[in-house]
Amino acid sequence: MKHAKVAYVPGFHILTGDARSQAATLVIQPGKHVGGPDNTHRGADQWIYVESGSGEATIDGATHPLEKGSLILIQRTQAHGFRNSGQTPLNILTFYVPPAYDESENELPAGQP
């Protein structure tokens, strides 16, 4: 069993994980965006859950609204990015299956836990 406290601080932060999955937070400030057409995870599916704020996700060129309670699955190799179109921080809890990053928050090559 692993336990982590979810704290939303600006940027991307790994919370916890094991060889099969990983949890992280992503906070995007108003008017800012992260990711884009070159942002993919070759070796991991990514689930995002919007805790608060609003914006949009662009996945393989299609735009989807993000609001509190949104849950989206981004499959491995799908290009994606997120934009905060609201007035408050966009707080996202994200899960990778399998892990996509090492402890230093560097992306892992496909197939490496």
What is the predicted function of each stretch?
Residues 1-24, 30, 35, 104-113:
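A short, N-terminal "cap"/entry segment at the start of jelly-roll beta-barrel domains
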Residues 3, 83-113:
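Double-stranded beta-helix
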Residues 27-28, 40-57:
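Short, conserved beta-strand element in jelly-roll/cupin
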Residues 36-37, 57-58, 74, 80-86:
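Short beta-strand His + acidic residue motifs that chelate non-heme Fe in jelly-roll/DSBH
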Residues 43, 62, 78-79, 88:
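A generic "binding-loop/recognition-motif" signal
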Residues 52, 60, 95-97:
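Cofactor-binding loop segments of dinucleotide-utilizing enzymes, especially the Rossmann-like FAD-
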Residues 62-76:
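Short acidic-glycine-tyrosine-enriched beta hairpin
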